From Swiss-Prot:
CDD domains associated with the record: OMP_decarboxylase_like (cd04725)
Lineage per the UniProt record: Archaea, Methanobacteriati, Methanobacteriota, Archaeoglobi, Archaeoglobales
Record HAMAP family: OMPdecase_type1_A
Record keywords: Decarboxylase, Lyase, Pyrimidine biosynthesis
Signal peptide residue numbers: none
Domain of life: Archaea
Protein name listed in UniProt: Orotidine 5'-phosphate decarboxylase
Catalysed reactions, as listed in the record: orotidine 5'-phosphate + H(+) = UMP + CO2
Enzyme class: lyase
Native species: Archaeoglobus fulgidus (strain ATCC 49558 / DSM 4304 / JCM 9628 / NBRC 100126 / VC-16)
Amino acid sequence: MKQLILALDVMDGEKAMEIAKKVAEHVDRIKVNYPLVLSAGVGIMKRLSEIKPVIADFKIADVPYTSSLIARIAFENSAESVIVHGFVGSDTLREVCRVAEEFGGKVYAVTELSSPGGEEFMSAVSLKIVEKAKEAGCHGLIAPSTRIERLREIRKAAGDMEILCPGIGAQKGSIEAVKYADGIIVGRGIYASGNPAEEARKLRRVLKI
């Protein structure tokens, strides 16, 4: 079953909780990033996890030991899964997956960013990242809805790995991404609207998920 994932990139913990409660019946998971965690504290993930499963989008990108510590902090604070940059290489990917396994969590590797800059360096190696992520034991991938031709190639290489796609909404990603993705990540299009719950409901209908 395909999922709608809220990227909750606000910088106020109470506002985040308010939005999460409003949209809870219309989204499947909540993705948090540095803006919220750095402003509200890492404990906000525990609070949000009482509403919906939380993806810690820390885009982990360091040496294996440091990356393992970041992953551990996320899982100890009730994250269901973490996001790691795929370009860090096999050793870091394996170490993050090892920590995830301790907690029964998931790891998603970024293949390429959905922003235009993602094409400058990452597109050239994204299929190699898919290969390394598979070998390391990652559960899934992050791939762009903003470049459908790239998403098609990543889907083909990924096989049955789960793919989550950001970029629909503010970044003008294509709704065609739904064909290739297991989850669609939407942020500003939901939380910055006048009625987040209604916007999330409409998105589910439009995307047929």
